Swiss-Prot record:
It comes from Mycobacterium tuberculosis (strain ATCC 25618 / H37Rv). This is Penicillin-binding protein PbpB. Interacts with Wag31. Changing A103L: No effect on degradation by Rip1. Pfam families: PBP_dimer (PF03717), Transpeptidase (PF00905). Residues 1-74 are annotated as: Disordered.
Length: 679
């Protein structure tokens, strides 16, 4: 038995610990880590595992079951630990990335883009209202209005947005109006309130368009616009002041017109836009998200400065009559164009400046392409013909090279500068006086006298008369015309200039030449702006241009008397001038006819049958008050429709009417008969 006991003991050592003092339940050796107890869920799982029938994989070989189980537990614990560490690190990385993104965005918001965002935020609150300045008026010398402004509205609409809103409202409730019917109702309302201008069809077409913004109508009375918008809130109203031209086409070539946004487009409306338009005012304030103005936020108040009134030298009555006469002359003569200018003989002020076929600025200018939109009197130079002979007449008298009664033996042609120049009619040698040379408008006699003057003095006289240079009248688009510099003259140049060929001038320049003779030899450059009147009523007169002495007073008086010969009548014809139809009974009238061949652009040569027909005259020769210049572009007949090619009848009509209008007394002395041809 003593041998058997030790053997059992050795066998038991392999399966349980050696005998010794038993530890109480829950006791732990010093230095030994306490293993965490299993949770209830873990114990339940373990019991469930034990209760399951053993499978092949659960059955471990004898002696290895405990070690394998422990090995699997260690592996499972390691795997679960590695997975936890991975998830933990991944989560930290994601959080770090999000923090970096947030920090970057915060940097951009608070540092990099801070100023712009602050401005944008302020802009969403800030509102600036513009207070339009009233455009100044344009009036004549008597303060009769040619152009003025009244307050008006433009009806606006946003087709795409409004239609979308109407369709969405219709989808939500059947009580909402049918979108297409609503548009038709709006079109009918607008057309009805505006007297069918535009008509309903035109309005509906705009309402149904694919545009984002359209104007339904312009120049609408504010009360009418308010009524339409109140009934149909979909329609907006925008302030667009209406420019009124009470005379229609009266002086439209001078006054001009404006475009749809109220700025100058043509004429003085364009060139004086800064003076007439004024400066808009404005006020800035803040508005909350509900659209209500934030109290106390008003700032940056700038009061509107209204435009100034421009006072012209024109006389509406004279302008109206001359414009009528010009249109009538065009119709009767068959001319392509007709223009006329009336100047005050003493001051050079423009009293009338008229063209035919003038546009109406109160209507849509864009639809008046067949009308005369420009101002040919200042912008379209032409060769004047014999009207230019006043230069030779003035020079020869001023330099004492001839006298009015000197008799010249004038042949039918003359050789000069390598060219042969003829008179307009065939004749042999004629005993014309110097007065008769100009009264009969002899080209040959004029060149004979011009040879006495010489090129240098003749050129100097051209410049004194203001040719080849702008007048500075104050109108846009003015042409200087053309006078060849003397150093570019060829041999034939001096054979052409004295008879009005080879140079060009505007109608205003031509009329200004005769103003110098009417004003005792002093040329006052013409002007059309008399004064400006500020909104506060203060008036600023336009400075009078400097006077230019052209010839002496005595020379001017002599030339005026010589030019009476042009309108002189003689039943026999010997002492009759070229423009007797210009005369006005009871008054001494003086003037000069002109005919000039037009240039054929195809060959650079002159047409044989296309002419400029001109006339310039003084009313009256003994007491000058008015200077009148007229131009007809290639007429088929006289300005009164009679056979011939003369503008003298138009001068007669205008001058005679002026004498009656102003109650000018008859000339006390009709003047002695002038000798044109010696007998």
């Amino acid at each position: 038995m003593s041998r058997a006991a030790p053997r059992r003991a050795s066998q038991s050592q392999s399966t349980r610990p050696a005998r010794g003092l038993r530890r109480p339940p829950g006791a732990q050796e010093v230095g030994q880590r306490k293993r965490p107890g299993k949770t209830q869920k873990a114990r339940q799982a373990q019991e469930a595992t034990k209760s399951r029938p053993a499978t092949r994989s659960d059955v471990a070989p004898a002696g290895r079951s405990t070690r394998a189980r422990r090995t699997r537990q260690v592996v499972d614990v390691g795997t679960r630990g590695a997975s936890f560490v991975f998830r933990h690190r991944t989560g930290n990385a994601v959080i770090l990335v999000l923090m970096l993104v947030a920090a970057t965005q915060l940097f951009f918001l608070q540092v990099s883009h801070a100023a712009g965002l602050r401005a944008q935020a302020a802009g969403q609150l800030k509102v600036t209202d513009v207070q339009p300045a009233a455009r100044g008026s344009i009036v004549d010398r008597n303060n009769d209005r040619l152009a003025f402004t009244i307050e008006a509205r433009a009806l606006t609409f946003q087709p795409k947005r409004i239609r979308r809103q109407l369709e969405e409202a219709r989808k939500k409730t059947s009580a909402a109006p049918d979108p297409q019917q609503r548009l038709r109702d709006i079109a009918q309302e607008v057309a009805g309130k505006l007297n069918n201008k535009p008509d309903a069809a035109a309005v509906l077409k705009k309402l149904q368009s694919d545009e984002t913004f359209v104007y339904l109508a312009r120049a609408v009375d504010p009360a009418v616009a308010s009524a339409i918008c109140a009934k149909y809130p979909e329609v907006g109203a925008e302030r667009q002041d209406l420019r009124q031209y009470p005379g229609g086409s009266l002086a439209a070539n001078v006054v001009g017109g404006i475009d749809w946004d109220g700025h100058g487009l043509l004429g003085l409306e364009d060139s004086l836009d800064a003076v007439l338009a004024g400066t808009d005012g404005s006020v800035t304030y803040d508005r909350g998200s509900d659209g209500v103005v934030i109290p106390g936020s008003y700032r940056n108040r700038h009061k509107a400065v209204h435009g100034s009134t421009v006072v012209l030298t024109l006389d509406n009555d004279i302008q109206f009559y001359v414009q009528q006469q010009v249109q009538q002359a065009k119709n009767l003569s068959g001319a392509h164009n007709v223009s006329a200018v009336v100047l005050d003989a003493k001051t050079g002020e423009v009293l009338a400046m008229a063209n035919d076929n003038t546009f109406d600025p109160s209507q849509d200018i864009g639809r008046q392409g067949d009308k005369q939109l420009g101002n040919p009197a200042v912008s379209s130079p032409f060769e004047p013909g014999s009207v230019n002979k006043i230069v030779a007449a003035s020079a020869v008298i001023e330099h004492g090279l001839s006298s009015p009664d000197e008799v010249l033996q004038v042949p039918g042609s003359i050789q000069m500068g390598g060219v042969t120049v003829h008179d307009a009619w065939e004749h042999g040698v004629m005993p014309y006086t110097t007065t008769g040379v100009f009264g009969k408008s002899s080209n040959v006699g004029t060149l004979m006298l011009s040879q006495r003057v010489g090129p240098e003095r003749y050129y100097d006289m051209l410049r004194k008369f203001g040719l080849g240079q702008r007048t500075g009248v104050g109108l846009p688009g003015e042409s200087a015309g053309l006078v060849p510099p003397i150093d570019q003259w060829s041999g034939s140049t001096f054979a052409n200039l004295p008879i009005g060929q080879g140079l060009s001038m505007t109608l205003l320049q031509m009329t200004g030449m005769y103003q110098a003779i009417a004003n005792d030899g002093v040329r006052v450059p013409p002007r059309i702006i008399k004064a400006t009147v500020a909104p506060d009523g203060s008036r600023t007169e336009e400075p009078r241009p400097d006077d230019i002495r052209v010839v002496s007073a005595q020379t001017a008086q002599t030339v005026r008397q010589m030019l009476r010969a042009v309108v002189q009548r003689d039943p026999m014809g010997y002492q009759q001038g070229t423009g007797p139809t210009a005369g006005v009974p009871g008054y001494q009238m003086a003037g000069k006819t002109g005919t000039a061949q037009q240039i054929n652009p195809g060959c650079g040569c002159y047409f044989d049958d296309v002419y400029w027909i001109t006339f310039a005259g003084i009313a009256t020769a003994d007491n000058p008050r008015y200077v009148i210049g007229i131009m007809l572009d290639n007429p088929a007949r006289n300005s009164d429709g009679a056979p011939g090619h003369s503008a003298a009848p138009l001068f007669h009509n205008i001058a005679g009417w002026l004498m009656q209008r102003e109650n000018v007394p008859l000339s006390p002395d009709p003047g002695p008969p002038l000798v044109l041809q010696a007998t």
